[in-house]
Amino acid sequence: KKILALVAILAIGLGSVNAQESLRWGVTAGMNSSKYSNDFLNSRTGFHVGVKAEMALPQVAEGVYLEFGGLLTSKGAKFNYGSLVNLKLNPYYLEIPVHMGYKYVINENFAVFGNAGPYAAIGVFGKIKAKADLSSAGGNIDWEEWGIDPSDLKGEGSENIFGKDKMKRFDLGLGIKTGVEFNQKYQVAISYDWGLLETIDDSDWKNRNLMISFSYMF
């Protein structure tokens, strides 16, 4: 509820200044492929959704603009070792990117753009999920002959991903984006974010996130 309220407030705030010719706002959503900066975990598929705004800066140069907004975005990674171990890290962040960009208008119905800049994010919720089945690790071993109940070699569980001695809530990073715009309303873009902060103390786990976005500008 808090997340929806923040997104709604941002949308209302942007809408209240939409009368200014230099600013327009829109909605955006898409798919993520996220991982961490180490080689231990694999990427996972997620999503993002939110609002965005573009403010033209003709006083700087024609085509230059500032892009900012608010996104609810999933990040994290996963690890699978056959059927033995399955681990998923599913953190969700409220992210605020602020990018400087340039848009080249080819004609009134088509333009290409690119932008880059920092983002700040706060972790809002998420789970660590783990599942293990070590009963098949011994091949044809009859565990009962060894006095081991095979069910004792299986287990699963989950817990909150953020908190003390867990993942840090705050993240800061850099992002780059490129895309195309149709009819001055529809945008398709691809972007990549590099987290600059360790998500866990004394680790090399920094967020990495590839996003494909679809936006509608009002």
Residue ranges and their predicted role:
Residues 35-43, 75-92, 123-171, 203:
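Extracellular/periplasm-exposed beta-strand and loop segments of Gram-negative cell-envelope proteins
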Residues 14-19:
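Sec/Tat signal peptide C-region and signal peptidase I cleavage site
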Residues 21-23, 43-47, 90-96, 110, ...:
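Residues that define the transmembrane beta-barrel architecture of outer-membrane proteins
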Residues 27-31, 49-55, 70-72, 96-102, ...:
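Residues on the lipid-exposed face of transmembrane beta-strands in outer-membrane beta-barrel proteins
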Residues 59-64, 110, 184-190:
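Repeated loop/turn-to-beta-strand initiation elements of outer-membrane beta-barrel proteins
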Residues 71, 75-78, 91, 151-154, ...:
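Predominantly the C-terminal beta-signal and adjacent terminal strand-loop region
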Residues 3-12:
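Sec-dependent N-terminal signal peptides
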Residues 24-26, 32-35, 40-94:
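Glycine- and aromatic-enriched membrane insertion/assembly motifs of diderm outer-membrane
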